[in-house]
């Protein structure tokens, strides 16, 4: 897939070195956690209340686009509660026994983090229901007429589920979460603080305007901001004095073909296809997928969310439509053959 080559993709697989760096700069407490003020305030109250009662925190669902800190927040929850974190992902839990092994190894009030929880198989998901509600594990012993069910008591624990596709969760599973938090794209100010903090932890010399320039091109996503910081660091070492200032950041990011609003070649290709090939739309997902030679899931989950959030495209019942902002960004003339309704939509 094309998106795996994108430096600004929050889904891009990371190298071992990058994972080590990310763990080193990852905030450990809510006090270090920048951005998401509503989430931070709520979680601080919920965690303090649970600790005062000496209870496990309510099961927590965290959802939002990739790279916004769902895994980071799960680690913070465990750290703030003073308990262990056991981590896995939906696709890894293929059999009921896989989940049973994890659950039976939990200590009191521990946190079990399941990433991509929407990808749990139905068999595994059914095991979770009594575990979440009653802290009990139902296991079938034997087969056929001799089969019998036994119940194993579990210690109180907190399940933290993370997903980019909250709509794919079944209602019975979603309803069992006592706390549901949505992570939003970060503001430029919050991202610049994250970039500045990461630079200091990596012993990099960075100016305020250098951090701000990286933040502006990071698509509201901390994972992308930290990745761009590492690439700008490389550029500063080779082409500059090692100091990350505005000029160095601008030159490095331009070399990486990340434009001033954070768009890369894939965003440009998507928007130009929509505006030049299809006169601004409306265009259906199947048509865009064929025109771009890209998977529908990648278009919906990776390319479009930021474009929609920033107001460059609209999803309507008839398909995707380029907005006036998109035409202005590329300095393109709005086609004369657009319908009156579409002209009105573009002007909103």
Curated annotation (Swiss-Prot):
**InterPro entries attached to this UniProt entry:** AAA+_ATPase, AAA_lid_4, DNA_helicase_Holl-junc_RuvB, P-loop_NTPase, RuvB-like_N, RuvB_C, WH-like_DNA-bd_sf, WH_DNA-bd_sf
Q: Which UniProt keywords apply?
A: ATP-binding, Cytoplasm, DNA damage, DNA recombination, DNA repair, DNA-binding, Hydrolase, Nucleotide-binding
GO terms of biological process kind: DNA recombination; DNA repair
Keyword Nucleotidyltransferase found? no
Q: List every stretch annotated Large ATPase domain (RuvB-L).
A: 4-186
Binding-site positions, DNA: 315, 320
* EC number(s) from the headed UniProt entry: 3.6.4.-
Pfam families of this UniProt entry?
Answer: AAA_lid_4, RuvB_C, RuvB_N
Q: Where does Mg(2+) bind?
A: 71
Where does this polypeptide localize?
A: Cytoplasm
Q: Where does the record place the region Head domain (RuvB-H)?
A: 260-348
Q: Name one GO cellular component term.
A: cytoplasm
Q: Where is this region: Small ATPAse domain (RuvB-S)?
A: 187-257
**HAMAP family attached to this UniProt entry:** DNA_HJ_migration_RuvB (MF_00016)
Instruction: Describe the family membership recorded for this protein in Swiss-Prot or TrEMBL.
Output: Belongs to the RuvB family.
Q: Please give the record's comment on domains.
A: Has 3 domains, the large (RuvB-L) and small ATPase (RuvB-S) domains and the C-terminal head (RuvB-H) domain. The head domain binds DNA, while the ATPase domains jointly bind ATP, ADP or are empty depending on the state of the subunit in the translocation cycle. During a single DNA translocation step the structure of each domain remains the same, but their relative positions change.
UniProt function note: The RuvA-RuvB-RuvC complex processes Holliday junction (HJ) DNA during genetic recombination and DNA repair, while the RuvA-RuvB complex plays an important role in the rescue of blocked DNA replication forks via replication fork reversal (RFR). RuvA specifically binds to HJ cruciform DNA, conferring on it an open structure. The RuvB hexamer acts as an ATP-dependent pump, pulling dsDNA into and through the RuvAB complex. RuvB forms 2 homohexamers on either side of HJ DNA bound by 1 or 2 RuvA tetramers; 4 subunits per hexamer contact DNA at a time.
Which proteins does it associate with, and in what oligomeric form?
A: Homohexamer. Forms an RuvA(8)-RuvB(12)-Holliday junction (HJ) complex. HJ DNA is sandwiched between 2 RuvA tetramers; dsDNA enters through RuvA and exits via RuvB. An RuvB hexamer assembles on each DNA strand where it exits the tetramer. Each RuvB hexamer is contacted by two RuvA subunits (via domain III) on 2 adjacent RuvB subunits; this complex drives branch migration. In the full resolvosome a probable DNA-RuvA(4)-RuvB(12)-RuvC(2) complex forms which resolves the HJ.
What is the official name of this protein in its record? Holliday junction branch migration complex subunit RuvB
Which gene underlies this protein?
A: ruvB
């Amino acid at each position: 897939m094309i998106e795996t080559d994108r430096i600004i993709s929050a889904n891009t697989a990371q190298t071992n070195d990058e994972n080590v760096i990310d763990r080193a700069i990852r905030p450990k407490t809510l006090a270090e956690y920048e951005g998401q003020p509503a989430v931070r305030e709520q979680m601080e109250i919920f965690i303090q209340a649970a600790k005062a009662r000496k209870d496990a925190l309510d099961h927590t669902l965290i959802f939002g686009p990739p790279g916004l800190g769902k895994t980071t927040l799960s680690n913070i929850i465990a750290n703030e509660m003073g308990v262990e974190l056991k981590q896995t992902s939906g696709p890894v839990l293929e059999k009921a026994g896989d989940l049973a092994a994890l659950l039976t190894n939990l200590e009191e009030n521990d946190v079990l983090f399941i990433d991509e929880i929407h990808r749990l198989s139905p068999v595994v998901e059914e095991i979770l229901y009594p575990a979440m509600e009653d802290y009990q594990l139902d296991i079938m012993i034997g087969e056929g007429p001799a089969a019998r069910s036994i119940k194993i008591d579990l210690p109180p624990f907190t399940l933290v589920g993370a997903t980019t596709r909250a709509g794919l969760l079944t209602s019975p599973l979603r309803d069992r979460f006592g706390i549901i938090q949505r992570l939003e794209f970060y503001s430029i100010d919050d991202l610049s603080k994250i970039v500045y903090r990461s630079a200091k932890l990596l012993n990099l010399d960075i100016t305020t305007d250098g951090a701000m320039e990286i933040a502006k091109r990071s698509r509201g996503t901390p994972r992308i901001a930290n990745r761009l910081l590492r690439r700008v660091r490389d550029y500063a070492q080779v082409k500059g004095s090692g100091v990350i200032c505005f000029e160095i950041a601008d030159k490095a990011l331009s070399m990486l073909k990340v434009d001033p609003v954070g768009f890369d070649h894939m965003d440009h290709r998507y928007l130009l296809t929509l505006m030049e090939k299809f006169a601004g739309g409306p265009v259906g997902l199947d048509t865009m997928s064929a025109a771009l030679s890209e998977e529908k899931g990648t278009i919906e989950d990776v390319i479009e969310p930021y474009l929609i959030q920033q107001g460059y495209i609209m999803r309507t019942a008839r398909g995707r439509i380029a907005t006036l902002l998109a035409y202005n960004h590329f300095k393109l003339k709005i086609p004369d053959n657009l319908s009156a309704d579409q002209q009105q939509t573009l002007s909103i």
